Amino acid sequence: MRKKLLSLLCCVAMVVSCVGCGGAKTDNAGAGNQGASNNPSGGTVTLVMAEVNPLDTIVGMTDKYFADKVKEYSNGSVVIDLQAAGVLGSENDVLDTMLAPGSTIDMSRISAFALTSYGGQKSMLLSLPYTFVSRDHFWKFATSDLAKEFLLEPSQNGTGVRGLFYAEEGFRHFFTSKNIKGIEDLKGMKIRVSNDPIMNGLVEGLGASPTVVSFGELYSALQTGVVDAAEQPIANYKSNAFPEVANTMILDGHTLGAVQVIITDEAWNKLSKEQQDAITKAGEEASKYNRSISQDKEDKVLAELKAAGCNIVEVKDKTPWQNAVKSVVEKNIKGQEDLYNKIVNMK
C-alpha cells in the first residue's frame, strides 16, 4: 500500500513538474534566453534538481540543505526545485534527460558510478569495491585537489554536465529476503544491479547473477522474486521500505557510496557570475554538512532497523569479500593505476 501511494504521488509530481518544461527558467522580463551574458542582472532562475531517494535519507537531507543555501547565498535569485523520491526517474533516466538538448532537468545528485556509462573514467575509480576503508578515507579524497580534478572530468570530456561537489551516503551493503550468514550464501542468487559494469563484475565475483532492474521497480522485483537481493546504503534501505520485502542486510560494506551533485552546462551558462559563485559556495557548505550528519544518521537508522526486527548480519572479516572481487579492481584500473593508488594511499 505504501509503495502504491508513493507511485501515485510520483505520477502527480511528474505531471506538475512537466508543466511549462524547458529546464532552467529565468524570471527576468525581456531578458535573453541563451548564455551567461544574457543574464547579467542575475534575474531569478529556477533550477529543477532530481533526487532518486526520499528527503529523509542522508543524500536527501544534503540536497535540501544545498537548495536552502543556494537561495540564501544568491539572495533569492536562484531557486532549486527539488524533485525527490525518484519522481523524475532513475539516475540513468535523469542523466539521459540532462544530456539531451533542451533538458527539463538542470541538476541532480548522482552516484559517482553513474557517470561511468557516460565516459567517466576517473569517477569509475571511486566505485571500485573496497577502495575506501573508512569515511575518513573518503573525505581525505573529497577535500583534496585530486577531487577537484575528478569533478572537472565530465565538463572537460564534453559530456555536457559539470560536477559541483562531493558527498557520501554511507557504505553500501547487500540485503535479501533469504536467511544468509556470510559470503557463501550469496552464490547463485539473482542480485539487482544498475546498468553499471563495476557492479556487474562485483556480483559475478561473488558467484551471484547480476540482474538489471530499474531502481523504481526494485521493490516489486524483490516482492515477486524477480531478484533475490540488492544493495543500498543503510539509510536508503530503510527510507525506500525495502525491509518490508527483504528483511536481512549483511554489512559487507563493499563500496562507499560516493556521490556528487552535477549541473548541465546549459543551465550553468545561463547563470550570472554572482549566481554561479553562490551555487559553488552553497556546494562547499553542503559537502561539509553531509560529512557532519552521515555517521549519526546512519547509526540512528541502523538502531531503528534492529529495533524493528530486521536481521542485521555483521561481517567481522572482509578478506574473503575483498579476494572475491580483486579481479574487478585489477581489470578496471588499467591505464589509471597511479591515479587509483593515489586514492588508496590517502587512507
Residue ranges and their predicted role:
Residues 16-20:
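C-terminal motif of bacterial Sec signal peptides marking the signal peptidase cleavage site
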Residues 150-152:
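Glycine-centered hinge/linker elements that transmit conformational signals in sensory
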Residues 1-5:
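Positively charged n-region of N-terminal signal peptides that target proteins for export
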Residues 8-9, 297:
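Generic detector of short alpha-helix boundary/capping microenvironments
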Residues 22-136, 146, 156-347:
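N-terminal secretory/targeting leader peptides
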Residues 139:
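N-terminal glycine-rich phosphate/adenylate-binding segment common to multiple enzyme folds
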Residues 10-15:
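Hydrophobic helical h-region of N-terminal Sec-dependent signal peptides
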